[in-house]
Regions:
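Intrinsically disordered, low-complexity and often Lys/Arg-enriched segments
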Residues: 1-13
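Interdomain "pre-motor" coupling segment immediately N-terminal to P-loop NTPase/helicase cores
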Residues: 12, 16, 20-72
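N-terminal pre-Walker A segment at the start of P-loop NTPase domains
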Residues: 74-96
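Short glycine-rich substrate-engagement loop in P-loop NTPases that contacts/grips substrate
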Residues: 85-90, 136-164
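Walker A/P-loop nucleotide-binding motif
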Residues: 104-120
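Conserved post-Walker A coupling segment in P-loop NTPases
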Residues: 104-107, 124-127, 131-150
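Conserved P-loop NTPase "ATPase switch" module shared by AAA+ and STAND
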Residues: 163-172
Length: 172
C-alpha cells in the first residue's frame, strides 16, 4: 500500500501542501500584524493573498528574465542619445510602448556595427518581461546553428515552435 504524505499539523503546513509557499512564509508575521492592528479576518485573508500573488509575480518575472538570456547590458537610461545622431528618439520611444506586440507586428533595428542595436534589443526584451510578456533574445548565429542541427523535419518543427512561443523574440 503506498504511503501517504504526513497529515499537516499547522496552518503553515496546510498552506505549503496547497502550494501557497509564500503565504506559509508570511503567515506568522501577517497574523501578528493583524492582531496588533485589529484587522478583520477578511482583511487578513486579503493581505495574505496579496502577498502570495506579489511573490508569484516576482518569481514569474525573475524566471522570464533568466529564460530570456539577456546577460549583462547597459540600461536604456544610460544610452547616449546624442550619438549616433541618426537615431530617431521618438521612434525608439514608440517601440518601447510595446504596442507592436498587441498588433503582432515586427520591429527591425538596422544600423552599422557598434551603435547600440544589441543594447536596445536587450532593453526591449527586459521591458517586455516587466510588462508581463514572455520574451527571449538570441543571436542570429545561435538561431541558425540550432535550427540546422536538428536531425529530422519533426525535430526542426518542434524547435521552431519553441522560438515562436515567446511574445517577443529578439534576434541580434
Amino acid at each position: 500500500m503506498p504511503s501517504l504524505d504526513p497529515i499537516p499539523t499547522t496552518l503553515s503546513d496546510h498552506c505549503r501542501q496547497l502550494g501557497l509557499v509564500h503565504t506559509a512564509e508570511a503567515l506568522n508575521d501577517l497574523i501578528a500584524r493583524a492582531t496588533q492592528k485589529r484587522w478583520s479576518p477578511a482583511v487578513l485573508l486579503e493581505q495574505l493573498m496579496q502577498a502570495e500573488l506579489a511573490a508569484r509575480l516576482h518569481q514569474r518575472v525573475e524566471r522570464r528574465l533568466t529564460d530570456a538570456r539577456l546577460g549583462r547590458y547597459k540600461a536604456l537610461a544610460d544610452f547616449e542619445w546624442s550619438w549616433p545622431t541618426q537615431i530617431h528618439r521618438p521612434t525608439v520611444d514608440r517601440v518601447f510602448t510595446l504596442d507592436f506586440l498587441a498588433q503582432r507586428e515586427n520591429v527591425i533595428i538596422v544600423a552599422p556595427h557598434g551603435l547600440g542595436k544589441t543594447m536596445l534589443a536587450k532593453n526591449l526584451v527586459h521591458q517586455a518581461i516587466l510588462a508581463g510578456h514572455s520574451a527571449r533574445l538570441l543571436t542570429a548565429a545561435d538561431l541558425i546553428l540550432d535550427l540546422t542541427s536538428q536531425d529530422t523535419a519533426r525535430a526542426l518543427h518542434r524547435r521552431l515552435r519553441t522560438y515562436l512561443r515567446p511574445s517577443l523574440l529578439a534576434i541580434d
